[in-house]
Amino acid sequence: MGIKHLYQVIAENAPDAIKAGDIKNHFGRKVAIDASMSIYSFLIAVRSEGQQLMSDTGETTSHLMGMFYRTLRMVDNGIKPLYVFDGAPPKLKSGELAKRTARKAEATEAHEEAKETGTAEDVEKFSRRTVRVTRDHNAECKKLLKLMGIPYIDAPTEAEAQCAVLARAGKVYAAASEDMDTLCFEAPILLRHLTFSEQRKEPILEIHLSRALEGLDMDRKQFIDLCILLGCDYLEPIPKVGPNTALKLIREFGSLEKVVEHMESDPKKKYVIPEDWPYQDARELFLNPDVREASHPDCDFKWEAPDIEGLVEFLVKDKGFNEDRVRNGAARLQKNLKTAQQSRLEGFFKPVARTDEEKANLKRKHDEKLQEQKKRKKEEAKAKKEAKARPRGAG
């Protein structure tokens, strides 16, 4: 799930932090990818007539189809992917996971009912809600990656946190995930939409943490507090606290401790904090997650030549894929992984830090932009009010 509305908050308040571009812009870059999030998206998106793809024996193959062709697309564009798989979830996440399981059970029931009485749209809607990534899905994807010559590692807990470690250490250029909480784990750069299909024509979004913090005028701890208030995987959200309120509260009070104190001392009790709301534990999980250091032997990885006959055996003979397409894909892998060895020029130079004057200018431009937005909203609200007050039929 990640952090609710965080992308919206950054886009509105720190637009310079987000850069949209083409996949080709990332030629020659190594990227650590959140495997579980990718597999989940493949299970939802790679479908035929609303149903997951199946082999002749009735086994789901959407995850393998997605993993093979989306990885191939990245390598075709000169990207060197490294997949990172989730380990055991932190204990604090178990409550959220239990809720997700309950929701999926309800969706399964509704899906069966829709098959009997509902429309095709109902069936597909509830079918997507029942999707979950299993151990078998993970194991099969790991087998496929090994045959493709694409490296993967297992994280102790959260894959996004391990991706962030590798990005901070410079072992990869960025962490790639649809989960915005990757930024809470201090990934310097987050890439979104990297594993989407070409047909969706979605630009790759590159989000820079340092620019987001600069635009929001927050330090990392305040940013994490904002994310917890927006709603994260570890805690229930506080009712009536939306993105604008969350941002206003953190800006006004500076920390969750003071926000909670304000809410609890409010005689009107405008906001009711859930009974069990260990926000300090959640913050600690973001600040000090269970990860391996980038120098750990388990974080060593390299790209190998694909095992073409092994891929044919697994994908064609076991899973019913088209042999010509698999062989063609393997040949492209072999050719393009060599091409991706070429380094980008940026790898030879360290980026120049912004001067205080440049930072001040950026902040001034950002503040002016915010004031302009507020002014426009005020004018729109005034015009709306006047239009409402005007008698019907009046020109």
From Swiss-Prot:
Residues 1-104 are annotated as: N-domain. Its main location: nucleus. Mg(2+) 1 binds at residues 34, 86, 158, 160. Mg(2+) 2 binds at residues 179, 181, 233. Residues 353-389 have a biased composition (Basic and acidic residues). Its cofactor is Mg(2+). Keywords: DNA damage, DNA repair, DNA replication, Endonuclease, Exonuclease, Hydrolase, Magnesium, Metal-binding, Mitochondrion, Nuclease, Nucleus, Phosphoprotein. Residues 102-121, 348-395 are annotated as: Disordered. It is an enzyme of class 3 (hydrolase). Residues 341-349 are annotated as: Interaction with PCNA. GO terms for cellular component: mitochondrion; nucleolus; nucleoplasm. GO terms for biological process: base-excision repair; DNA replication, removal of RNA primer. Residues 122-253 are annotated as: I-domain. Phosphorylated. Phosphorylation upon DNA damage induces relocalization to the nuclear plasma. It is found in: Nucleus, Nucleolus; Nucleus, Nucleoplasm; Mitochondrion. InterPro entries: 5-3_exonuclease_C_sf (IPR036279), Flap_endonuc (IPR023426), HhH2 (IPR008918), PIN-like_dom_sf (IPR029060), XPG-I_dom (IPR006086), XPG/Rad2 (IPR006084), XPG_CS (IPR019974), XPG_DNA_repair_N (IPR006085). Binds 2 magnesium ions per subunit. They probably participate in the reaction catalyzed by the enzyme. May bind an additional third magnesium ion after substrate binding. Belongs to the XPG/RAD2 endonuclease family. FEN1 subfamily. HAMAP family: Fen. Interacts with PCNA. Three molecules of fen1 bind to one PCNA trimer with each molecule binding to one PCNA monomer. PCNA stimulates the nuclease activity without altering cleavage specificity. Structure-specific nuclease with 5'-flap endonuclease and 5'-3' exonuclease activities involved in DNA replication and repair. During DNA replication, cleaves the 5'-overhanging flap structure that is generated by displacement synthesis when DNA polymerase encounters the 5'-end of a downstream Okazaki fragment. It enters the flap from the 5'-end and then tracks to cleave the flap base, leaving a nick for ligation. Also involved in the long patch base excision repair (LP-BER) pathway, by cleaving within the apurinic/apyrimidinic (AP) site-terminated flap. This is Flap endonuclease 1.
